[in-house]
Amino acid sequence: MSEINDFTNSIIINESDTKYEVYSEVNSSNRWIAKEDCPSPLEDVWLLKLAGHKRKLEEPLSCMRNEEPASKQREIEKFLRTDLDHSENDFLTQEVDEFPSTQQLFPIPLQNDTAFDSSEESITKSSKSSFSVLDIGLPMSALQRKMMHRLVQYFAFCIDHFCTGPSDSRIQEKIRLFIQSAHNIAKHPSLYDTEVRNPSAAESTNSHVSLDASNFSSYAENSSKFLFLQELFKNLSPSYSKTFFLFISNQFLANTLTQWLKSQNIDAELWAEEDAKTSQHPAIWICVSKKAPSASHFLQSCPDLSATIFYDIEAYMSVTSSLPSIQSLVLRLIHLGSIEHAIKCFQSSYNASFLVNIVGVVATLSSSSEENSEASNLSTLFEKSGNFEEILGSESHSSITEKTRDIAKNVATWLKNGENFSSWPLPPLMDLASLSVAEPRDSQPSVSQVNDTFVKSSDSTFPSSQSMQSPSKLHSLTSNATDLLSSSSLKKNFFSQQEADEVELSNNYDLQGAAVQYLQRRLRMVEDELHEAINSKNVQQSRSEELEQQISKLTDNLQEYRNTVRELKLDLEKSKKKNEDLSKLEVEKVEEIANLKKELTHLAKQQEFGFKYVQEFSNEDLQGKLIEANEKNYKLTQLLKTQKEDADFITNQYQNASTFAAEQSKEVAKLQAECKRLQAINSKVMEEVKVYNDSRVEALLAKVSSLEETLKILEQKSLPKFTPHNQSPRIIDSN
């Protein structure tokens, strides 16, 4: 029974194919148990704990799924994370309620409370201001294009519904989210990380917020506006002495742009209210649009002001609504193919269809070529303009950088040459008004043409310029056609009442068919979302399995930590004992110190007693003895000095002699070795000479003997000449 209790209080921390690894909380030990030998209560407890652990993991996931707005934003975030960089991921994680309304997106007074109804008078007033506005079209970076494409892909259903079908408050909120995200992309991609991860930094007005210098290069790479401003001031300096004033709608971007320009050795400063009275001006003042009233006097009276630059379209609309008159030249930076470009092209027709056109055109421009294959007027427009690559984003990064630098160089040259408007070096921006999705073309279409266009629009992923028609416009066209037919029948009796009913029935049938196709497309979108939800569930399940493995590893680490704590407790007890021994030793040392102090006191008393007798001698005697001792000490010192010098001399002599003796010994040894060598050579030579002499003597003796023999022979040969006459001839012949 106790063993079962031990098992019940145990935890299975690991599992193999045939065994369980069990950690016992009673004795704090691990052991392996075969599965067939493992009691069933232990397995039941293990399974219950495992099920409880899985429930704990699934609880936060279910809570996430129950949060309708937040979960939708997480779907957006997950969708945008696919094959994207870190800087592209987190820009749609805020709640929908946190995004500003249409009135805040376009800071122009509205006539009523309708979300998408604005004042035509206000936009006409701002567009017809007294100052001259020159638009500088800059290509979007690859990152901005990719983010816009992903953004349109995600909001495709809402965009299609908003442009072709009836839109309720939920669709309008999503469209507000889409518009705000498109504005942020047009400003700078780095804005999202700051707004999502650190909202206080994005809203902060502190101009001394430090930025990571390693990321400075990414600011110009991700936005051609940063690169344009850098190249513009590099081409202007140092000969150009006038100052510029730049308006920007976001405080964080203002801080970032200021510090980035300073890092490029450009004199840039943030504008403050107290700067209106200063007489010294940098190369460029950077001002947030909400501070525009404080700069009104400066813009009107500064003689050194060259131009007022608007970084984004929001800043332009906000500033021009509060400052209707600007005396200087106005330059407006616009990304080609962005929402800024669309607003610029449609601001002359600011009516109820304004946002429908903006959303539809931006969706069309940010879609792929396959998605825009049905938009024939789109390709015709690009062929006429010649800016196909700039709008659809088929240019490379190096080409975008080179084009931006050329634009900045041309603008700088134009400013240096006197700002002649007739010689403005940049071509006008492409007019996107022909891509209108909520207004009719040159010729008014018939009712059947409108219905056919409405049916065709259901087959495309994104509404093209031909296929998208607003529901209000469609209804008005149908009503106008019906009214026209009715009035004609009354005046000329051309149509009968039966024919009018047939026309109305045909129109209703076409509308129902379009609605069916719209619902089918919506069903496909829901199926895609369901597929993504299933994939997300699989990812979460794999993540839970990874967490289980991590928990098992953490359990092992916990056991190691417990063992470490036990060892530390033992060390603590040893330390306590050691401290007790040290405290005892300290007490003994204190007692020893006290005894030594007593001895010192006793010795001091004895010393005082001895000094009494020393003090009885007279000072004169002591001084005389001291003088004698000093003289004696001086003599001994001199003697010691002399002896030391003698000793040093003797030592030096001895050392020199020793050195010389060692050298002589080495020389003698060397000479002895040389002598022995020469003796050996001499003896060898003598032996060779002796051998040579002996051999020579022997050779000479042999030669002498041979000569003697020869002489004898010769003598014998010469004897007949001196032979006596009485010698016999036979003897002579014999000789």
UniProtKB/Swiss-Prot annotation:
Disulfide bonds: none annotated. It comes from the Eukaryota. Residues 514-719 form a coiled coil. One of its GO terms (cellular component) is telomere cap complex. One of its GO terms (molecular function) is molecular adaptor activity. Its main location: nucleus. It is found in: Nucleus, Nucleoplasm; Chromosome, Telomere. Component of the meiotic bouquet that facilitates meiotic nuclear reorganization of the telomeres to the centrosome. Links telomeres to the meiotic centrosome component pcp1. Essential for the formation of normal telomere clusters during meiotic prophase. Required for telomere length regulation and chromosome segregation. Required for proper positioning of nucleosomes at heterochromatic loci and for transcriptional gene silencing (TGS) function of the Snf2/Hdac-containing repressor complex (SHREC). Interacts (during meiosis) with pcp1. Interacts with clr3, pot1, taz1 and tpz1. This is Coiled-coil quantitatively-enriched protein 1. It comes from Schizosaccharomyces pombe (strain 972 / ATCC 24843) (Fission yeast). The gene is ccq1.
